[in-house]
Amino acid sequence: MTARIVHIARNTFREAVRDRVLYNLIAFALLLSGAAIFVGQISIDIERLVVVNLGLTAVSLFGVVIAIFIGIGLVSKEIEKRTLYTVLSRPVRRWEFIVGKFFGLAGTLVVNTFFMAIGVFGALLYVAHKFSKPDALILVALYFIVLEFFIICSLALLFSSFSSPLLSAVFAFSLFVIGSFADDLRGFAGLTHGFTRWFATGAAYLVPNFSALNVISAVAHQQPLGAQLILQNTLYALFYTAMALSGAVLIFERRNLK
């Protein structure tokens, strides 16, 4: 990683801090802990299940919203403020700008996830009074959630490289929703025929398979997660992220910024 990419990533992270994203998430973590504790206390004998399910789902959804709405503005804000022209007038290549923005946003989301994870574990400790061995699976679920954020970040940058912030948000959110039901879409494709089957199958394999990264229910029910699943999801997420980021770079390299 070049020094220029690191510098852009660091500035992107600082901008997120100045926008008080991290402070809002700390408050969110506290609210999440309180809500999970309240729901857990009124859920007899399933306190742990409720806290883990509610907590991890909130971490995922809130992080996706942050990834989309910060990601879609990373390029457009620089153009509107005309700071992009200053950056590119220096010995900074366009691909370095995109990659630096990605790492800056990804780093922001990793820190966000850390703070929200503290809220989840705090709520779990309150209702269960201790940690058990299966609770380590929560770390795997959080890892998959971070991989999910990486894909969303790359998609947000991809769409923002050629469209308006509004359309970028619509595209990214739509892909998130469709990708969350990718497995169901593949099952539906197997029940159809002709053009519908062809279209559904193509869509199921083109959209990011977020359903494979969602192990929240399995973790809440303390079901084991194999090393093969972790490896497959890691390779899949990194590959999809790299492809989307490459697309963003190619489009941005050819974009007329005048």
What are these regions (language model features)?
Residues 15, 76, 87-89, 156, ...:
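Helix-capping/transition residues at the boundaries of transmembrane alpha-helices
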